[in-house]
């Protein structure tokens, strides 16, 4: 009988909590969205599967060595950790002390847990290498740069303003998060508000990079919101675009784009990086990798490297990035009131960014002979190339011969640049406070 009891106690099912059960269902929902609905499957599938692995009871795949120690509830070991942190020897007090501790102290406690015989789970290791170091989002940005054509932006530089205007959604969302905190509805710190705001840029790698730096405890919810709403761009944007434009404006035909020379395409990423990085060094990592990837593409002398970055490398890193995000889909971090706030603010951010881009296009038309179709302003959010396709689709509904795709790629690419710069602004000023 004792053997049977020991066998049952060894089963993960016997230790399944309500929170873990809910998160398993959330993970299955993400898998269903990725497979059945094809919502950003390249990221949502590994994120969903990482969520499944993270919530298997007793497996500890997403736990660091220190988290494994705290989950073990050994009184002697808890006393040692508590003495180092000068707090009461219970799990809750230790977690509160760790949250307030400096990163160097947290690393010391992690090393102490390793010395006591605990090891981090495989997903925790993935997270430390891929996101904790910031490497994975940067490599993906390099791949995105290698797949990006700056031609439409260079052919019509005014569209850079549309991409810049769409970033208004980012900063409006930061204010929204702080407003919720001010009125006591949902508690958000300034770093958390900044990390949530970047969802408005519709740029998954940037959202993961910034939240990993500013609010790693919210990374799972922010990443899920960012990629889910990116997949929903065809549903979110058209009503806003139609509400802000007239039938006549939607029928505006833009002049043919000029041919951009190879020299311009080679010089642009170099000049862009130097201008932005010299003024805002904190934007250099993201923008630097993006421009490097684009330079490999446009130079034409490293085709093997460009092909590797666009295909093999970005695919491999995407797998580990998704699983690493899944490591944050654990019940005690995801099932919080903050998650609802993130989901709400995320969709508002998309809406504001879309509206700002459209309104900027209308403003430019007031002082320009060559009119811009306001629909391409919505492509200023950096969901590449989905936002540009939505602009083209809505335009074709009003005029079946009005093809806006290449025109919309200009603000779409500008949006990628804008979101990287916005992330640099957040890092510089939020971390300085």
From Swiss-Prot:
User: Annotated Gene Ontology MF terms?
Assistant: decarboxylation-driven active transmembrane transporter activity; lyase activity
Q: Which InterPro entries match?
A: OadB_MmdB
Q: Does the keyword Transmembrane apply?
A: yes
Q: Record keywords: tRNA processing included?
A: no
UniProt topology in membrane: Multi-pass membrane protein
Q: Which GO terms describe its cellular component?
A: plasma membrane
* Names of required cofactors: Na(+)
The processes (GO biological process) annotated in the record are: sodium ion transport
Q: What does the record give as the reaction this protein catalyses?
A: oxaloacetate + 2 Na(+)(in) + H(+) = pyruvate + 2 Na(+)(out) + CO2
Where is the chain membrane-spanning?
13-35, 42-64, 125-147, 160-182, 214-236, 266-288, 308-327, 339-361, 413-432
Top-rank lineage group of the source organism: Bacteria
The main place the protein resides is membrane
Question: What is the enzyme's class at the highest EC level?
Answer: translocase
User: Quaternary structure?
Assistant: Heterotrimer of an alpha, a beta and a gamma subunit.
User: What is this protein's record name?
Assistant: Oxaloacetate decarboxylase beta chain 2
